[in-house]
From Swiss-Prot:
Cited function: Catalyzes the transfer of the diacylglyceryl group from phosphatidylglycerol to the sulfhydryl group of the N-terminal cysteine of a prolipoprotein, the first step in the formation of mature lipoproteins.
Organism of derivation: Pseudomonas aeruginosa (strain UCBPP-PA14)
Protein name: Phosphatidylglycerol--prolipoprotein diacylglyceryl transferase
Annotated GO MF terms: phosphatidylglycerol-prolipoprotein diacylglyceryl transferase activity
Residues where a 1,2-diacyl-sn-glycero-3-phospho-(1'-sn-glycerol) binds: R139
A cellular-component GO term for this protein: plasma membrane
Keyword Cell inner membrane: yes
Broad class of enzyme this protein falls into: transferase
Domain of life: Bacteria
Length: 266
């Protein structure tokens, strides 16, 4: 059994102002994505400037935060937030939904593309390899917050979490960091080393994320207010991942068939 590191959720406090690690992880994720995007920008569109990239990152970040929070409210804990709406604004306590964040990003990208003459999937393919940075940082934030831990386990790396009772548990946040953050980043980065059909990168992203998240949900404790939805193992996270996997497969098939059907230059 490993010892859970006692980390103060507050990274920095200046008087009444407190900066939480959870929020700081979002800033790290957004900043890291911007740095990598600035390196890939000219390959994506030689006419783009740092200002336009910053504009895109800003709106995507808004989509992540607003969509992620509203997604958690709608998918995971609607009754509590209806009873006490002010809790919606307490984001430093956690409570973000990836699936809601993805929908928020999709809306932001659609709107940005309409303004700047880029198709939805052109922009999504550009953004997708950057997203694992934020996902990985967010899972570290979950770990520091001692939330979203896994089921009781006797594996050698199990931990006793401050909010998880006296028994050791799977550090499922670290599993998600390794899969959604590290593995997904490597897969997408290798896949995009050469030109790919439009929408195929987006398809690979949602396919891999859906598979990784579905698998980790087997060892992650579901939200207490929801529990298991069916058969003693099906979680809301898994329900939301099924359409992602199907959409990812469909997108990749469509992208490659569409590319094959287009006339090639002589």
């Amino acid at each position: 059994m490993l010892t859970y590191p006692q980390i103060d959720p507050v990274a920095l406090a200046v008087g009444p102002l407190k900066i939480h690690w959870y929020g700081l992880m979002y800033l790290i994720g957004i900043g890291g994505a911007w740095l990598l995007a600035s390196r890939r920008m000219k390959r994506f569109d030689p006419t783009w400037t740092k200002e336009r990239l910053s504009d895109l990152v800003f709106w995507v970040a808004c989509g992540v935060i607003l969509g992620g929070r509203l997604g958690y409210v709608l998918f995971y804990n609607l009754d509590e937030y209806i009873a006490n709406p002010t809790l919606i604004f307490e984001v430093w306590k956690g409570g973000m939904s990836f699936h809601g964040g993805l929908l928020g990003v999709m809306l932001a990208v659609w709107w940005f593309g309409k303004r700047h003459g880029k198709s939805f999937f052109q922009l999504m393919d550009f953004i997708a390899p950057l997203v694992p940075i934020g996902l990985g940082a967010g899972r570290i934030g979950n770990f520091i917050n001692s939330e979203l831990w896994g089921k009781v386990s006797d594996v050698p790396w199990a931990m006793v979490f401050p909010n998880g009772g006296p028994l050791p548990r799977h550090p499922s946040q670290l599993y998600q960091f390794a899969l959604e953050g590290v593995a997904l980043f490597v897969i997408l980065w290798l896949f995009t080393r050469k030109p790919r059909p439009t929408a195929s990168v987006s398809g690979l992203f949602v396919l891999c994320y859906g598979i990784f998240r579905f698998v980790v949900e087997f060892v992650r404790v579901p939200d207490a207010q929801l529990g298991y939805l069916a058969w003693g193992w099906l979680t809301m996270g898994q329900v939301l991942c099924v359409p992602m996997v199907l959409a990812g497969i469909a997108l990749m098939v469509w992208a490659y068939r569409r590319d094959a059907a287009q006339p090639k230059a002589a």
